[in-house]
Amino acid sequence: MSTTATITQQAERIVPLNVEANKYPKPLQPSGALDKFTFEESTPVIGREYPKVNLVDDIINAPNADELIRDLAITISQRGVVFFRAQDNLTDEQHKQLVHRLGELTNKPKDSTLHIHPLLNSTNEFGVDDNEISVISSNVEFFQDRIKDRDDRKQGAASWHSDIQFEQYPADYTSLRLTKLPAGGGDTLWASGYELYDRYSDPYRKFFEGLTATFSGEGFLRARDARPDHYKVYEEPRGNPANIGDELKAIHPVVRTNPVTGWKSIFAIGNFPKRINELSERESREILESLYKRIEQNHDLQVRFRWRSPNDIAFWDNRSAFHSATNDYDGLGERTGHRAVGIGEKPYLDPNSLSRTEALKRA
């Protein structure tokens, strides 16, 4: 039996492309608890900013905190990414617990908690003393070929991605709080997987909906193999009992349904999807490159966020949004942040779910 056939059979067993209709969660609706806060839509398609909200005082410690956090999660899932400024009184513990509660209050699996990154955790010298907080630093060099790595980053090569797609149960919500900013540059961009799906014709959508992809975190394994005395892979459960070992490989649908909104999103974007299992190697490469180029070439499905002050913070939904850092700050200082990543459900496609545009027309 060919390798392709074997992978396809595995995908049919593993990926819940079609399950009983009553097993699918119903989309969630906000209560309106956040409506009292001033906000700005960053673009028509993606992004929202609450310029005056203090997360600790106004949300975490509010009498109706659960209601507010649930509505915040729904808003993040609908808008893709949500921003807050200068959260100077937010601790790492509050930061990560807020990310976890976003998922809990929107019905993520009970055994899904917070992700422990395979490399960026407290077992390595660049981590903090907390496995559930990853330090994102411009000083971290995974690979020995610094000239090539720097050139790739300058060109923006392979930079759009969704967090930890290589896990059996990948991320739901991620939050990044920058603690140290360069003198200039270092913006982050997000792109809408909902809008990417919407921009294809119905025949293309149906084609994509029948596909699965193999996702791999092989880059982290290369880093470990290059410097085994320096990097170690965390092999214990990483936020879910199924996320174990050092294989860092999973099969997921190319199109998935976001359980919070009920909207379809392209999911196979970035460095982690390595192969579309039902296609030839050449066809797979062409499709993955085409999806990626759609993100790169359509600025109107993106939002760009300028980090203005330490402790600016972003929350996004990895199931339907992709992000990319801008590496344009060489010689302008260090860029450092603390990241917390929640673990969600195993990706699935509800064939009766709608696109974002279809759902908004019906609302």
Identify the function of each model-found stretch.
Residues S2-Q78, R85-F315, R319-A363:
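Fe(II)/2-oxoglutarate oxygenase catalytic core
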